[in-house]
């Protein structure tokens, strides 16, 4: 006893299993399992594979197949006496998993797509079930009841179980694949989601039937009793208890909470454990009781999402991986040592995959899908994953199948799950999906496109789509402004910029008695001008005949305004780009959001509600969307959004920030180099290392990155003058420079209407001698544009030559040193520097000048707006 208390210091072997202290070895086993699972998942995650594959493979590696071949490994690390402890934790995890699976079943969504879901779900279950019954015949005669001491299994029980194993579809894995491939909003994805729920429910019912048949011990009367009791228990839970629980939660205002209270969570867990206990003692399995309990939790106000978010972390991180790793430990591939064994393995894989694909494809085609859509639906329905492993483990523990058959079917589950994602991408590529969306677009949208009108009736043919000169800038217009919200901290700087860029219904300009006729001129130094003139030229009015019915009847002409590129009503779209993790909460939220009308997405997302309020106040047409994406797929998700070449995609990012570490003084740390701030940017905003390279190369619209470096300030002076500075460092202007100029002019124009008194300046390479004159000529009809509106400052600057050994200051460093006045430097935190970015080198995410601006902005605490113009030429 003394040695036991003393531990390893007293000579106790920590790998010796002690029944009086089983926790010691269990902790090591759990750490080993979780470590191997996460290491193996790294390469599989890059191939878009679900984590269950890594967890099962980890168990296979740690089990008798590989590590088990090491002498004394199994007796030391996983002794037989320690397995019950692992199984206890694993079974607790799978009970919670089945409860979460019940929470995922959306009855309202099934009703909405009931016809297609029933047809596809039943057919994709019935056809593989029938072929599974045929496969069970040779399997039974070859492997069943061959080992002495094993439980004798009837053929009917064996056949039902094998057929269920062949025919099930893994709904949780299916839902995650739909999210990762961005199919959950497509017609094929919606059909598969509904059919997967039907298939899943019916599969669990059939599995329960096989367990009941095996537990009845040959008595038909017992079988009937178990079936009746199970059905009665389901009715009790699904009707009186379900409505009673909803009534109690409403009366206690539980559904209105941001997260469930501990008491409500405890009561729901109590309901789940009671149901699992009851189904276990009547001879079914505790997982079915947990599944039934998940079905009765109300979905009002996304309560199931909030409940799952509160409960799921420890089960998903610890318990469930241990369950699937234990399933892998039971796989001994060394038992498959005959040719016929591998013949049955390949036959099982072929039957499981192709019966699902063929039946799903034909049925989906009959319901109205295109051939490739239907094929994708069939491929997705062939996914096995988590559910298959649970089914097989239940069958192994019940003695229905042997370890050899268990190993065969685990291989089938791994292969069928592994091929689902690449096969879906092969038969249903992005290019084909875009064509399907266009063919399914509404006639109203097609008519609008054919008429050349945007959402507000502005003639698109009069809007220039290219930016090759200052004359093009005067005719340019942004189609739709889309802001992609990646983090909560990006909301405030995004709204500040949108307040200047938004093209809402403009108020009428104030009349001024005195008109400033000063033209644009160049300045060699920067000085603060007087308050900006609010003078705006009276808009040109043209007489046109009205196209409205009322005016046609009265035969009256009306006066209409000819909108300039800086006027009119442009639409605003807000995209909440949420990180898709392994959490069940993300799956519940994504599936529930896409069940609603997409025009009302803002009502279900608190971040989008902020932009909805902003658009209402600004009188801007507004739409919104929530996109769940993995970190690796964020660039692809943004690039595949519906957009035109003249749209502007704005991505606000959180940059450098002040830190408060317990003292009343803020910590303002400086960055040593660009790589330091760049890694900080990626980490803060949950972006992959290839994000910017991918987005610049694949996005088919204008793109702007806003980096806010002033987050964390307290008591900021809200009345300081806002400053917007455009940097034109090249001796010539590129298309992205022209886009930056257009945005600066747009900010100036809107600022004149709003009377915000912002300062707008252009810092240009002094080699662009005729820039001011050319700008005045191009905007001769725009009297609002003069030197009181915008300042042009010459910056003597020589472009760096790579071969030169002497380090020269960058353009932004020169501007900060000699181009800004003392007042402007004092207001540097209220300043946004705009710079154009053409396609950077493949080896770097940004060009050298842009990298310098980002670096200086992070250390000097000014905001940066990097713009890139997309050219279809």
Curated annotation (Swiss-Prot):
Pfam families: Na_H_Exchanger
Residue runs in coiled coils: none
Membrane-protein topology: Multi-pass membrane protein
Extra facts: Present with 172 molecules/cell in log phase SD medium.
Protein's name in the database: K(+)/H(+) antiporter 1
Organism of derivation: Saccharomyces cerevisiae (strain ATCC 204508 / S288c)
Transmembrane segments: 24-44, 52-72, 83-103, 117-137, 155-175, 189-209, 221-241, 268-288, 317-337, 342-362, 376-396, 405-425, 727-747
GO term, biological process aspect, one: inorganic cation transmembrane transport
């Amino acid at each position: 006893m003394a040695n036991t208390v003393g531990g390893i210091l007293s000579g106790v072997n920590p790998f010796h299993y002690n029944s009086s202290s089983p926790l010691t070895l269990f902790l090591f086993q759990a750490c080993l399992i979780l470590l191997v699972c996460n290491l193996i998942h790294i390469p599989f995650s890059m191939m878009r594979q679900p984590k269950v594959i890594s967890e099962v493979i980890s168990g296979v590696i740690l089990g008798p197949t590989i590590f088990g071949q090491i002498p004394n490994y199994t007796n030391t690390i996983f002794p037989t006496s320690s397995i019950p402890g692992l199984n206890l934790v694993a079974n607790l995890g799978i009970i919670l998993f089945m409860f979460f699976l019940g929470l995922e079943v959306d009855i309202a969504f099934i009703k909405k797509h009931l016809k297609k879901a029933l047809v596809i779900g039943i057919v994709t279950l019935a056809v593989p079930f029938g072929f599974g019954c045929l496969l069970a015949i040779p399997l039974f005669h070859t492997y069943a009841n061959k080992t002495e001491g094993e439980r004798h299994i009837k053929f009917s029980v064996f056949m039902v179980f094998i057929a269920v194993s062949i025919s099930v579809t893994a709904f949780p894995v299916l839902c995650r694949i739909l999210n990762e491939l961005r199919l959950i909003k497509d017609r094929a994805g919606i059909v598969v989601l509904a059919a997967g729920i039907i298939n899943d429910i019916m599969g669990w019912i059939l599995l329960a039937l096989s367990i009941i048949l095996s537990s009845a011990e040959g008595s038909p009367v017992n079988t009937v009793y178990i079936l009746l009791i199970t059905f009665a228990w389901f009715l009790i839970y699904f009707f009186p208890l379900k409505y009673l629980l909803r009534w109690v939660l409403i009366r206690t205002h539980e559904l209105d909470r941001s997260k469930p209270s501990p008491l409500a969570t405890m009561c729901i867990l109590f309901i789940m454990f009671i149901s699992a206990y009851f189904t276990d003692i009547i001879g079914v399995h505790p997982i079915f009781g947990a599944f039934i309990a998940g079905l009765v939790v109300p979905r009002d106000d996304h309560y199931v999402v909030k409940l799952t978010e509160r409960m799921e972390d420890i089960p998903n991180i610890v318990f469930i991986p241990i369950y699937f790793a234990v399933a892998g430990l039971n796989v001994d591939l060394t038992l498959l040592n005959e040719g016929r064994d591998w013949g049955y393995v390949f036959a099982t894989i072929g039957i499981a995959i192709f019966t699902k694909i063929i039946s799903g494809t034909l049925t989906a085609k009959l319901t109205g899908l295109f051939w490739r859509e239907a094929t994708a639906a069939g491929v997705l329905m062939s996914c096995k994953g988590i559910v298959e492993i649970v089914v097989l483990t239940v069958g192994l523990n019940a003695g229905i199948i042997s370890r050899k058959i268990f190993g065969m079917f685990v291989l089938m589950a791994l292969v069928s799950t592994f091929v689902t994602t690449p096969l879906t991408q092969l038969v249903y590529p992005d290019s084909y999906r875009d064509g399907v969306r266009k063919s399914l677009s509404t006639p109203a949208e097609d008519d609008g496109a054919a008429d050349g009108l945007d959402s507000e009736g502005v003639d698109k043919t009069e809007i220039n789509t290219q930016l090759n000169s200052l004359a093009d800038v005067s005719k340019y217009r942004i189609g739709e402004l889309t802001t992609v919200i990646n983090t909560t901290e990006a909301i405030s700087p995004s709204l500040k910029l949108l307040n200047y860029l938004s093209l809402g219904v403009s108020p009428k300009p104030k009349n001024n008695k005195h008109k400033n006729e000063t033209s644009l001129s160049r300045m060699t130094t920067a000085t603060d001008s007087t308050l900006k003139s609010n003078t705006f030229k009276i808009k040109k009015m043209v007489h046109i005949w009205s196209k409205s019915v009322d005016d046609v009847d009265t035969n009256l002409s009306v006066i209409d305004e000819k909108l300039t590129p800086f006027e009119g009503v442009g639409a605003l779209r807000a995209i909440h780009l949420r990180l898709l993790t392994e959490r069940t909460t993300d799956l519940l939220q994504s599936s529930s959001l896409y069940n609603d009308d997409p025009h009302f997405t803002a009502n279900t997302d608190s971040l989008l509600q902020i932009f909805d309020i902003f658009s209402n106040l600004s009188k801007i047409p507004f739409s919104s969307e929530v996109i769940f994406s993995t970190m690796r797929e964020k660039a692809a998700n943004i690039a595949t959004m519906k957009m035109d070449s003249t749209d502007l995609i704005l991505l606000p990012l959180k940059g450098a920030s002040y830190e408060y570490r317990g003292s009343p003084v803020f910590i303002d740390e400086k960055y040593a180099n660009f790589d330091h701030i760049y890694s900080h940017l990626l980490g803060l905003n949950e972006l992959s290392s290839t994000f910017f390279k991918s987005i610049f190369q694949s996005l088919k619209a204008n793109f702007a990155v806003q980096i806010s470096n002033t987050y964390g300030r307290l008591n900021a002076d809200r009345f300081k003058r806002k400053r917007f500075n455009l940097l034109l460092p090249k001796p010539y202007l590129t298309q992205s420079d022209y886009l930056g100029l257009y945005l600066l002019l747009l900010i100036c124009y809107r600022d004149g209407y709003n009377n915000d008194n912002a300062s707008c300046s252009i810092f240009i390479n002094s080699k662009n001698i005729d820039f001011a004159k050319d700008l005045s000529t191009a905007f001769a009809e725009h009297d609002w544009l003069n030197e009181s509106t915008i300042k042009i400052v010459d910056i003597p600057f020589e472009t760096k030559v790579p071969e030169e050994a002497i380090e020269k200051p960058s353009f932004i460093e020169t501007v900060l040193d000699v181009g800004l006045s003392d007042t402007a430097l004092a207001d540097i935190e209220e300043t946004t520097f705009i710079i154009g970015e053409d396609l950077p080198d493949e080896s770097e995410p940004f060009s050298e000048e842009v990298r310098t601006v980002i670096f200086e902005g992070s250390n000097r605490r000014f905001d940066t707006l990097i713009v890139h113009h997309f050219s279809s030429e």
